[in-house]
């Protein structure tokens, strides 16, 4: 299934350190040649300061059991630089520890004033803290790096040349330490910055494309992520446009989120539209499963695609944890759609489709109807399942209306903003004609 593997393309939009979990995950699969994969990991890790990881990868490649002199020297240099940076920042960090116990840390301006007044804080100290945070990150010490990055965020002005780098670094470090709540906060902060920054159209598109890929890691690991990924990828026009323009393969993750989110079935209609629009640029078993089921009503095709979906998900680092849930919810979708179209279906036919015994299938269907709150009845004597009409609840109708209006509002806001920028640029260009 290498033709459906997205690791190579996803890694193009991830920080080097964020690619390591994906590459190590692939090492446990039989998709690529293990030797070539380890060589690529070694090539990538050599560009960092993670000397121990480099040595471990060399051992896995049977290159050497002893650390080469070059690596010994490099490790000594890394430790020396780290010590120097820590010494430069130590006085300020000691002051920060003292101030943590007071109320000043809660307010950025008060905190900076206290540092300047009582501890002779200067811009050079901030630069040193930034360098140390970045160096710790390059060494793979992500947890300690987050402390210095947090300090930089409190002290730095959003206009600082390094502010955007700190936002990206903080998000990456929180992802790598699996702090999903904080990672979501950092993701939201970074998205707000990107959406409000004065980037060119190309720069904004690039920033959003990177953010989309990083956010997938957060969304599939955070309890609220399944709703948030739908809101961001499907109902925020700027991000949907970025997906359609730069990374249509992200449709896999959006489709997966909709399938496993039973409370957001109202998003299916909008998702199917986008899948059909992008079908000429990207297709995979997950998007094709939804097309088979909701566009072509090809139930046999959907059943076959579901089998392929299992293989795809099993080999995708981002969504492998959703495998069982995806299969269960996909079966539910097949059942719902099939029964609503045919209205009356024999239990034996469903049992055959589900690879179950008739009595097991009947119990499964009873529980399914009860849990999914479907309007259906089972005639045990005739062995039939009879489906009634399933009206859309007022709540679902309201959610659909809100999503639709929100999407249109954002689209209009984007148009107004672009026209305003064009007008400003035109006025600026015209002003030069007088000189």
From Swiss-Prot:
GO BP terms, alphabetized: formation of cytoplasmic translation initiation complex; translational initiation
Keywords linked to the UniProt accession: Cytoplasm, Endoplasmic reticulum, Initiation factor, Microsome, Protein biosynthesis
Phenotype reported upon loss of the gene: Homozygous lethal at the first instar larval stage. Larvae are smaller than wild-type and die 3-4 days after hatching.
GO MF entry, a single one: translation initiation factor activity
Superkingdom assignment: Eukaryota
UniProt-listed PROSITE patterns: PCI
Keyword field contains Transcription: no
A Pfam family matched in the record: eIF3_N
Family from the record: Belongs to the eIF-3 subunit E family.
Protein name from the UniProt record: Eukaryotic translation initiation factor 3 subunit E
Organism: Drosophila melanogaster (Fruit fly)
Highest classification ranks of the organism: Eukaryota, Metazoa, Ecdysozoa, Arthropoda, Hexapoda
């Amino acid at each position: 299934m290498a033709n459906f593997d997205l690791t190579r393309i996803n890694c193009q939009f991830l920080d080097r350190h964020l690619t390591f979990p994906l590459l190590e995950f692939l090492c446990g699969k039989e998709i690529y040649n293990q030797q070539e994969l380890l060589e690529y990991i070694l090539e990538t890790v050599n560009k960092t300061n993670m000397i121990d990881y480099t040595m471990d990868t060399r051992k896995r490649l049977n290159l050497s059991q002893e650390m080469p002199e070059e690596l010994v020297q490099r490790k000594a240099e890394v430790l020396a630089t780290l010590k120097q940076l820590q010494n430069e920042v130590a006085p300020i960090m000691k002051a920060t520890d003292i101030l943590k116990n007071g109320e000043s840390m809660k307010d950025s301006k008060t905190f900076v004033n206290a540092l300047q007044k009582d501890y002779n804080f200067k811009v050079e100290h901030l630069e040193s803290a930034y360098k140390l945070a970045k160096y710790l990150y390059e060494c793979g010490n992500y947890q300690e790096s987050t402390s210095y990055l947090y300090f930089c965020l409190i002290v730095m002005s959003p206009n600082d040349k390094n502010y955007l780098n700190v936002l990206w670094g903080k998000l990456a470090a929180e992802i790598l330490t699996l702090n999903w709540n904080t990672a979501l906060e950092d993701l939201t902060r970074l998205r707000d910055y990107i959406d409000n920054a004065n980037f060119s159209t190309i720069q904004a598109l690039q920033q959003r494309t990177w953010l989309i890929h990083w956010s997938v890691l957060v969304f599939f690991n955070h309890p609220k992520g399944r709703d948030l990924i739908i809101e961001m990828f499907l109902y925020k026009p700027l991000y949907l446009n970025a997906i359609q323009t730069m990374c249509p393969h992200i449709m896999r993750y959006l489709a997966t989120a909709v399938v496993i989110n039973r409370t957001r079935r109202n998003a299916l209609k909008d998702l199917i539209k986008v899948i059909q629009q992008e079908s000429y640029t990207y297709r995979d078993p997950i998007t094709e499963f939804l097309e088979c089921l909701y566009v072509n009503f090809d139930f046999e095709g959907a059943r076959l695609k579901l089998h392929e979906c299992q293989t795809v998900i099993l080999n995708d680092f981002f969504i492998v944890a959703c495998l069982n849930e995806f299969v269960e919810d996909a079966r539910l979708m097949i059942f719902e759609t099939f029964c609503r179209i045919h209205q009356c279906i024999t239990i034996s036919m469903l049992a055959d489709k589900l690879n179950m015994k008739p009595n097991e299938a009947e119990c499964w269907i009873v529980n399914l109807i009860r849990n999914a709150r479907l309007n259906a009845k089972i005639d045990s004597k005739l062995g039939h399942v009879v489906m009634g009409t399933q009206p859309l609840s007022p709540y679902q109708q309201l959610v659909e209306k809100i999503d639709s209006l929100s999407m249109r509002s954002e689209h209009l806001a984007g148009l107004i903003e672009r026209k305003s920028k064009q007008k400003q640029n035109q006025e600026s260009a015209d002003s030069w004609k007088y000189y």
